[in-house]
Amino acid sequence: MVLRLLWRDPFWNGKRKPFGIGILMSGIMVILLFLTMMSYMYGVLFKSGYRAHNLNILAVDYDGGIIGEALSVAYEQFHGDEFPELQFHTPAKYPSIVEVQKAVCRGDYWGAIVTQPGASNRLSQALRGGSAAGTYNSSDSLTYINNGARYPAVQLGDISGNLETLIGAVSSVYHALNGSQALSSLNASNENAVLAFLNPIKASHIDIKPTEQGTRVLFNTVSVVLPIIQQFFFLMAFNGINNQFGIYGRLNSTRIGLMRLFTSIVYTLLASLATTGYIWAFRESWNVNGGQFALLWMSYWIYMHINFLILDAATAFIPVSFLTFFVLPWAIINVAATIYPFELSPGFYRWAYALPSHEFYSLAIQVESGCGDVLYRALPILFSWEVVGLALAITGSSYRNRHAEAELIAVGKVQQSASKSDNNTLYDDERELITMNRLSPVQ
């Protein structure tokens, strides 16, 4: 029958208070940990709408007429903290729309809007009727450019959405600035001319890398944090298997270190292949090729291997009961570094340029879109993490092995001492029996 101890049982004497304090303190520590981490995470997005002006938009007036003027005046209506900042430059600096597109692709600007050459003249001729009215296309007035692969959610809401709002206002401003003159020259008997007057200005759109699949919202969130959790789960299983088979303490540290290094390389290679595979499997109509698959695979590989090394070192030095206080913050600060662009977050968060997740995601954007040269920054930072992680993992493996070896030696000494004690006891018993036999009378 199983003995069930009541709270008032003597078993609890001297244990009630420490037991209760232990549970209470653990609960408080975990609550404070999550409070701190979620405050950090929420801080990334706190009042981000009021930082939209940090998103710079290149504006170039190739028209030089009333439509270019209408664009400038319309922007003044929206100019403020909650609207991206248009930075106007002359055609001399950006001689063609191709140069504007290259500037957006390089990452110099989050987007661009330009007036098409001769747009005002084409509209003026269309209002007079004739063949010009029949061939007039209001979408040839303005063009806006963006890179849909660079933080897709931000591109959809803050860039494309705001630019389309601005473009809608340009038409109203045009009528306010030039409506009377346009009406005086309007050929009211020509249907196409009237349509040109009613809808004078629209915009064409150039998306450098359309990224419209539903899974795009996971690229800089779930697909950044899950590789960290994945390495942690595997390491817990890997360390458990090593302990079960008594590997530590019985092999020299060099062999164990090489075994763990080989395992980390092979496992992260396969894990990164699987991750890239499911991204490709759900890409829908996303226009990417095999070369980009391979480069993204390699990007995930180095990112996962860095996390493997960091967590391997952590599991070596930090007791299992306290690992939560390292793994959770490590995961949160890394995903917070990619969930939103730094332009929309408080300046404090820019320290996360140094984190592997941010450089990995920057590298992934370059691979996916072919834009934004970040290799000069991303590769040195990722390589530094790889070197530091490898050094920590080697140190941790050596520490783990020495600690296990010391435990084996201590256990051996205890067993040896117990064996000697048993032998001495047996020897004493034998001597006592012999003495008793000698003293007993012969029958």
Predicted region positions:
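Hydrophobic transmembrane alpha-helix segments characteristic of membrane transport
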Residues: 141, 204, 239-251
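Residue-level detector of solvent-exposed, low-hydrophobicity positions
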Residues: 47-49, 82, 95, 241, ...
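Extracytoplasmic/periplasmic domains immediately adjacent to an N-terminal transmembrane anchor
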Residues: 1-214, 410-443
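Membrane-spanning alpha-helical segments of multipass transporters and channels
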Residues: 42, 213-236, 245-428, 443
